[in-house]
Amino acid sequence: MTNSLIQPKGSVSKETNIQSIARITGSKIEEVKYLEDGLDIAGLKFVYDSSTETIWKLNGNETGMVDSWNIVDESTIIIVTNISSYQINILEQIILSNDDAAGKIGTSNGLSVQKNLDNISNNITLDTGGVLKDALKFITPEMFVINNEKYIHGTTLDAVPYLQAAIDYGKTNNLPVVLSQRYPCITFPQTYELPRDDGTVYPGWITAGTDQNIDPEPIYTMRAAIRLYNDSVIIGTNMQTTGIRGNWSKTSGPYDLNGTIGVFISGDSGKDGYVRYHMHDLNISGFMIGRLCEGISAFSTEDNLQISSCGITGIFQGEDAVERGFIKLWYNIAGDVFGGQWLTRNYAYASTYLPPYPASDIYRAGWNDSSFTEKYHYYGDTSLNFTHTAYSSLDNFFNTYFFKTANSITTANGGRLSNNKQTGVWPLGEYKGITGRAKTVYSRYGREILNCNILEAKIMWSPRTPFYHTSQSGSWVGNSKIGNVILERVGIINYAAGNTTGNRFNVDNVDPWDPSQNFFPAMVCRGNIGCMDVTRSGHVQQSVSNEINPIVTGGQIHRQYRRSDDTSSYSMLTLQEFKNSWVSKYVFNSSYAFVQPLVFTSSNAQFKYDYGTFTPVLQIAGSYITLTEATGIYHRFGDIIRIHIRLRNSNLTINTAGPFRISGLPFISSSIQTGYTKGSVFTPQATGVTLIPLVTPSTDVLTILKDSAGTSFSHPAGTFDFSFHADFDYVISFNS
């Protein structure tokens, strides 16, 4: 009867094993030791043999220093000390779960249920054939007995041992863990080692004499309530009433390494491998970090998750091909954070440049590719304004222990970054904080973020721009997209004050992680992500929707169905702009197109075409002339204006002869250096001369010349059947 302690790899140490044994046996940590030469066994309750992964229960009368030991059979070990020899039995299985011993399952340590299932459920037949074990397709925490006690909701103070026992058994036997309650988590036996580099650098750069290895970074750890493994499956009945809950406080913290992690996810290889897990229909609340995934999450699924009352809803080293359904982030300080972890000194992301040189894959680059979320709803904590210390503390926490901006300085200049870099790598990602934002995806080492998409999103209070993706200048490969989003209370500092003067983010405050930003950069997306459709509700600081316009690389064709007898003119595509109201900038109508001025090369003048009328005003010898007809028609061809003027008065008396002047032209002419007036003029009183039209430079006034010397035409005095006709072109300034 072998009582093995199954402890997967990945951020697991001897200390962690001892803590796990103490937890499942109900002992103090100092009462559990690894079995090794020279061990003083006096006062110990349990010893652990790492070679056979077995736990042995001492009788309490053993003394002396261990000289040797011999496992007689699967149930017995003989330990020899410098005082005596002792026969010890393996930690016995205790079958307790209900009043009928024949139907009980569970163990005293929560790790050997399989033996009991084999011994008991294999012998209980079902009416439909087979045995009871065949019908057991899931595990619950209530199936386990620890320290002769089973979990009773509302009575048991700490559900962590029962939760972990169920998860461990489910992992071993490929069974899902089903939660039917919100289980309290008081203890945090799991250990997570925070990101750090090992001090090494790519050997080729050392050989070249331009880089060298240095001391590794110090080890820092955090505590977690439960741990999921590769292929772990944990599901509840709904996101409201089933899950786990801690007692961490958003208002008072702690906001440092003493904070807690709810769900720690890690595969066998820790940071240097993939992990695949499945969490559905759960509520995770009351932890500094709701869920933390070590390694690259690949082919994992999450659905109907509510993460509430947490500091950071999730931290992920990276992910690839992950699918999420409905993710509801309810009253937290920061949404999910992906990537951005300092895990190597090398300014590179190719496996050749990553330890152990080469790495089996680029896990330590923390890449993010091809994830899809159906619904992503973020509700900021309306009781905590951005001025609350929780925001700055958690921003600093993530930078201090994950992103580590100070490390981005090259080693030669006092930082930890390699002096060399991979050829063609994009710029390092910049840290812009994580709090007051729905989702943050960082690229730490210049590897592009590719196609991390959301179908539908809802934002209810996000002081910063809700979505941020690192964008490498010059590369927009993998442009991620959000299908549609609804916004409410975005870009404001104090939730209750709304979008008012003094409360506008980036305008009325300085973001400590983006101090040069003096206007709100975007309502929805910053960096290499864009939203395709935006609904703006109340109290949103107005800006562009996306800092970088999303790219549609596949091309598009827009088609509209109409009634076969419909002959009306209608819009097939309209582009509008909002500043104070919606204004149509481009309308592609079924019968015409309304467009802005055309530019045929990037540095050329804008082309406009226009047609209209105006009323010319005539002066002769400085006197205004009353006319019975004054018609002006113009056509605009870019910067060239074509004019037709017709003036009539069949009984006009002119008292004083003098120069001819017509004002009121539709456009101001350009300076004389850019062109002259060209055209013809006719009036019956101009005999023996050829009249020349001239628009005075930088005015809207037409004068009439009678020769090329520039002599003004003087209209004679008298009473006339007056008529005047002019057709001419003149030039106006470019782009006016």
Swiss-Prot record:
Subcellular compartments: Virion
Entry keywords, A to Z: Degradation of host capsule during virus entry, Degradation of host cell envelope components during virus entry, Host-virus interaction, Viral attachment to host adhesion receptor, Viral attachment to host cell, Viral tail protein, Virion, Virus entry into host cell
GO CC, one annotated term: virus tail
GO terms under biological process: adhesion receptor-mediated virion attachment to host cell; symbiont entry into host cell via disruption of host cell envelope; symbiont entry into host cell via disruption of host cell glycocalyx
Primary location recorded for the protein, binned into one broad class: virion
The keyword Repeat belongs to this UniProt entry's keyword annotation: no
Gene3D superfamilies attached to this UniProt entry: 3.30.2020.50
Record keyword Iron present: no
Known role: Functions as a receptor binding protein (RBP) and probably mediates the attachment to the host capsular exopolysaccharides. Displays a depolymerase activity that specifically degrades the KN4-type polysaccharides of Klebsiella pneumoniae capsule.
Protein name, UniProt field: Depolymerase, capsule KN4-specific
Gene assigned in the entry: S1-2
